[in-house]
């Protein structure tokens, strides 16, 4: 990759630590752009290092560590099998990746979700179900719940949800751009795998239709 030529080896090592490599590809691309703009690596390396130091946290914040475990198991790298349930029973499959870790002094968790995976051939323009986005998960002690902020600039899709534990699962409730109820859930959670469900309701929340599921395995 071009950025390996431009970025120093120690910077690659440091960014790889950042949130289980979640931000490493984004930061590396930023460093490459800075290098091209300024004709050298020293300035861009320093700027990337500054962002890494300010954003990354090695562990959850001590003042709420007992609550951060709801999503703490997500920290690390994952591969996902994406299954899209289309109209009339049609199914589309793809492969993707997730990178997650602690940020903002450990008071939040950030993860990057990418479909298809970066080592796969990507369509231009993006195909149905392709995305490259990030989630910021912030625990709110007043609500005893999590603010979920999803941003996918590739498709201009943005979601705000509230996440809570429901038994052994995690359920995030919100709405889509039409106001229809949307439910995203983490289920079947183990130390090395989970199943994620994306559902939407067309009747105000009485019933939900499964649109997509991700079967994730830790790597």
PLM region descriptions:
Residues 34-219:
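Hydrophobic small-molecule pocket/channel-lining residues, especially in calycin-type beta-barrels
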């Amino acid at each position: 990759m071009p950025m390996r030529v431009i970025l120093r080896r120690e910077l690659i090592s440091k960014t790889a630590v950042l949130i289980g490599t979640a931000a490493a590809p984004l930061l590396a691309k930023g460093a490459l752009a800075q290098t091209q703009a300024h004709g050298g690596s020293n300035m861009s390396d320093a700027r990337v290092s500054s962002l890494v130091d300010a954003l990354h946290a090695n562990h959850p914040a001590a003042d709420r560590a007992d609550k951060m475990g709801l999503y703490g198991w997500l920290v690390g790298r994952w591969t996902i099998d994406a299954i899209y349930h289309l109209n009339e029973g049609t199914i589309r499959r793809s492969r993707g990746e997730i990178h997650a870790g602690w940020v903002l002094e450990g008071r939040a968790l950030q993860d990057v979700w990418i479909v298809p995976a970066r080592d796969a051939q990507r369509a231009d323009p993006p195909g149905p179900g392709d995305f490259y986005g990030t989630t910021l998960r912030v625990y709110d002690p007043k609500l005893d719940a999590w603010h979920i902020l999803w941003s996918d600039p590739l498709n201009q899709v943005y979601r705000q949800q509230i996440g809570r534990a429901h038994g052994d699962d995690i359920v995030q409730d919100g709405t889509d751009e039409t106001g229809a109820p949307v439910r995203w859930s983490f289920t079947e959670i183990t130390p090395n795998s989970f199943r994620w469900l994306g559902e939407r309701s067309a009747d105000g929340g009485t019933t939900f239709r499964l649109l997509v599921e991700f079967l994730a395995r830790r790597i």
